[in-house]
Every structure is written in C-alpha cells, then in structure tokens.
C-alpha cells in the first residue's frame, strides 16, 4: 500500500531535515524493553509483499499484496520452507488482484479489499489451513474510491476518498450507506476539500474489536490514531490522538495532490487488538534520517479502548506487522528485513 500511495500522491519531496525528536507524550507512561524471539524465516516461502497476517496454532495465514484467487495463503510454521498450503495460489487464467486492508474480525475468516474494483473478498480460515480456498465477495458502494475496509457479520466499515465523511458504514443487512465523522485536521492547511483530506489520511490501518462494537483507525504517514464506537445511530468518536501531524505540500488545482516531505514522521505500521487492549506498532521515524528504516517499527504502544495510552514497549528488531494469537494470548510480529522472520514478543 505504501508504494501505491507514492504513485498516487506524487512521492516524497526534499526539504530541510529535522533531527529525530521523540514524542513527549509517549514518555509520560511506563516503558519496557522486551525480547523478540525469532521463530521462523519466511523468505523461502515465495510470498512477497505481505499485506497482513494472522496466526492460529502452527499455521500462519498470510495476505499477499497480489493474488489471483482469494486473499490469503497458509504457511506451516513447523516447516516454513515447505510448500505453501494453498491449492489455488496461482490460477493462470485469472488476472492478479491488487489487495489492501488484510483483516480478520473474528479469526474465522480473513478479508482484503481490491481497491481497484471496490470488492471486499473474504476467505474462510478453516479451509485455508487445509489448502482449500473458499471465496465470497462483497461489492462496496460503486462510484467511490475505497481504500481500507473491515467487516463483521452485519456491516462493513471503510475509508476512501470520500467527500461526505471520514468513514463509510455499509449495512450488510439492508444495504444502507452512511458517512460518519469528520477527517482529522492538518494545521498547515486549515482549509482543504474533504476529498483532499481523504487523500492525506488514505494510508490507514483499521481494526475492529472482537465484539464488533468498536474499532481503531490509525494513519501510516502521521501520528493520527482514532478510537471509535459503532452504534445503531452510526459511528461515534471516542478519542482522536495526534502524536504528530503530517508534513506535506498540498495543491488542489488543477487536481488534488499530496507530497510528503522527507522530514515527515511516519506513524503506525500495524495494529493488533484484543477485547481489552490495542497494540499499535509506531514508527515515529523520518525518511530524511532513517531512509527505508522509517517503514518499520521498534516500538509498540498499548492503549485501552477509551484511547488511553497505558504503556510502551521497545525492541531491537524492526517490525512491519503484528498479530495477536487469541488461543495463546501472545503477540507475534513479522520483521522488516529480507528474512521476513516471524517473532514472538515477550511482553
């Protein structure tokens, strides 16, 4: 998704670089150094461009960025260099889909969004672990550019280049559509079109609480993290935190364009949730100082669902993704290096 957004928005522009400054708000809570234990090397699996993952027992359900059939492939962690357990990973007669927003609300299925078509594709997890792909498709409302989506049994929440609100709430019961809440502001550009704000905060991570009654949405290109509830009336914002604002150059004529400066501080790389907690991988780095290291995180922020920061965790290895194994009650990550190692975090 990050590479795609560079093309859409014009890339990163040069500017005088700042030295890296830590967020003072993160220093007000307890911080611990934790160990990341490497478990398996995924570099030999043939899967590249990971869009997200979940872990169940000794199986890793991985969402690649490009797929011809379904949204995920399964890796046996006991034999990670062996055959990927997916009978339809390559179907020569079908075009490749470009996927984003890999998600799993209840652990029983995984979804990803084909943002070129607005189709939310769902695979049941149990068949995937046996090498079988069973796919269903939900077409999100046409006429909009959808970018990120997550679903429960009753509704889909998505973000996109929307002119009527930050979030789209799409009912799977009656097909109704509601746009909810405003976009976060950008102090350097206080007056922007809504769709331009949609571009500014397009690269996001969205995770639903397991009961489907709340969600968290965080920006990858700034320190914005939004805590929300879902009710019969729509979406209610509980708290909006802004650890850093985007440092950008924006033009709206003739067409909206967003360019990120090299000193822009990157935000949230991934999020894992439990019924009680939110675990967010936070970068806080800049391209000017860290180059490609800005796209991995060495810090984990723990929030409650009211948006209160509880504590932070630091680790030596840079992570690009994170997931929570509900059965084990443990957090796992995938490293951002060439080995793409699966690690267990000992919090």
Feature-to-residue mapping (PLM):
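Sequence/structural signature of beta-propeller modules
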Residues: 11-42, 237-239, 346-347
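Surface-exposed loop and turn segments in beta-propeller and other repeat-based domains
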Residues: 30, 34-44, 85-96, 135-141, ...
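Beta-strand-rich domains and repeat architectures in extracellular enzymes and scaffolds
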Residues: 38-70, 272-286
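Repeated scaffold domains used in trafficking and secretory/extracellular systems
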Residues: 47-53, 95-103, 141-153, 203-205, ...
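Short coil/turn segments that connect the beta-strands within blades of beta-propeller domains
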Residues: 57-59, 106-108, 152-154, 211-213, ...
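Beta-propeller blade signature
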Residues: 74-77, 167-172, 293-307, 346
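Asp-box/WD-like beta-propeller blade repeats and closely related beta-sheet repeat scaffolds
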Residues: 115-155, 159, 186
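Loop/turn-rich, solvent-exposed surfaces of beta-rich toroidal or solenoidal domains
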Residues: 261-302
